[in-house]
Curated annotation (Swiss-Prot):
Pfam families: ADH_zinc_N. Belongs to the zinc-containing alcohol dehydrogenase family. Quinone oxidoreductase subfamily. The keyword Metal-binding does not apply. Its EC number is 1.-.-.-. This is Zinc-type alcohol dehydrogenase-like protein C2E1P3.01. GO terms for cellular component: mitochondrion.
């Protein structure tokens, strides 16, 4: 079986003798037809400390060919599903290979109204967005009956609204009934507003904090920093309302000190949804049952949200060529010379 692995020289290479996995109890075996890139893919594989031979890849779309014990064959065999695997943190269960196995509860069925490439843009970053906004901040998920959540006068600030995570945070916050203000580059303003932002701000503007406060009438009470750099988190916290007493800003991975005692920065790690422990370059990531339960709930509802147009996938930059195309495409992705698009490689 072909797979893409760390080559031990801060790069990746394609091999043809990787073992084909076998589904265990509660799992499926799928033939991978699409993979999408996330920053963790290149940041882990382009790293001298990663073990040579580690298989890479997180987001995938696959056609189910077999299932393990306890899984309804009539429901899954032949179905097209999408999810994300632990990837480089667990090289035995990663997406960049011809076949993949995973817990059937951690994938969603791809609806007919979106393409496999669009489907590949969702798993990891949508999970991250929902984990932060819905699980940790407690904002309601979009209804599944066509109704709407009640409107709120409070604002949610989304820093880096045009990132993959940010685009899904904007949509989820909008459907939660909150007003949304997002930072991004001006050329992405229209797209981010289409996704649900009420106001967009150029994060390059030296007065970005003052602009946010004025636009929201000093009413930002929740935030999600999808960039999660120390400087972006500091600016985001400063933009919170002067009236806030228990503000919360979601940060991916880390929890840096907050410049305001009344605003807490909450670091989230989406790997906690897997029922096993990971070592993230010396930092232990332990499983959290609530994160697994939340992910299962979200994946059950995601197919319907996509069918109804409640959730819009990221825009796609697609690469042909199968697994052999990944090394070159990954280098382009790592260069950062792209905006508001998700890199997807066709494997079939």
């Amino acid at each position: 079986m072909k797979a893409v692995i760390a080559d031990g020289q801060n790069g990746v290479e394609v091999i043809s003798d990787a073992p084909k996995p076998t589904p265990e109890k509660g799992e499926f075996l799928g033939r991978v037809i699409r993979v999408a890139f996330n920053p963790i893919d290149w940041k882990t594989l382009y790293n001298a400390s990663i073990e040579k031979g580690t298989v890479g890849g997180t987001d995938f779309v696959a056609v189910v060919e077999d299932v393990g014990e306890g899984v309804d064959r009539s429901k899954y065999i032949g179905a097209t599903v999408s999810g994300w695997a632990p990837g480089p943190l667990d090289g035995s269960n990663a997406a960049w290979r011809e076949y993949i196995t995973l817990d059937v509860n951690l994938v969603y069925f791809v609806p007919k109204n979106i393409t496999p490439s669009q489907a590949a843009t969702l798993p990891l970053t949508f999970t991250t967005a929902s984990q932060g906004l819905n699980q940790y901040l407690g904002l309601p998920l979009p209804p599944t009956d066509g109704s709407k959540n009640s409107a709120q006068q409070k604002w949610v600030l989304v820093w880096s609204g045009s990132s993959s995570v940010g685009q899904y945070v904007v949509q989820l916050a909008h459907h939660a009934g909150y007003k949304v203000i997002a930072t991004c580059s001006p050329h992405n303003f229209d797209w981010i507003k289409k996704l649900g932002a009420d106001f967009t701000v150029d994060y390059h503007d030296p007065n970005v904090v003052e602009i946010i406060k004025k636009a929201t009438d000093d009413s930002v009470f929740y935030g999600f920093d999808a960039a999660s750099f120390p400087e972006t988190s500091t600016l985001a916290v400063k933009a919170f309302s002067s009236k806030v007493k228990d503000g919360k800003l979601i940060n991916i991975l880390s929890s840096p000190p907050s410049p305001r005692s009344e605003v807490k920065i909450i670091g989230i790690i989406d790997y906690s949804l897997f029922n096993r422990e990971f070592n993230f370059f010396g930092n232990k990531i332990e499983p959290i049952q609530a994160s697994y339960d939340h992910a299962v709930e979200v994946y059950k509802k995601l197919t319907g949200w996509l069918q109804e147009g409640v959730i819009i996938p990221n825009r796609v930059k697609e690469f042909d060529g199968g697994l052999q195309a990944i090394p070159k495409a990954l280098r382009e992705f790592a260069s950062g010379k792209h905006s508001a698009v998700k890199f997807v490689v066709r494997i079939d």
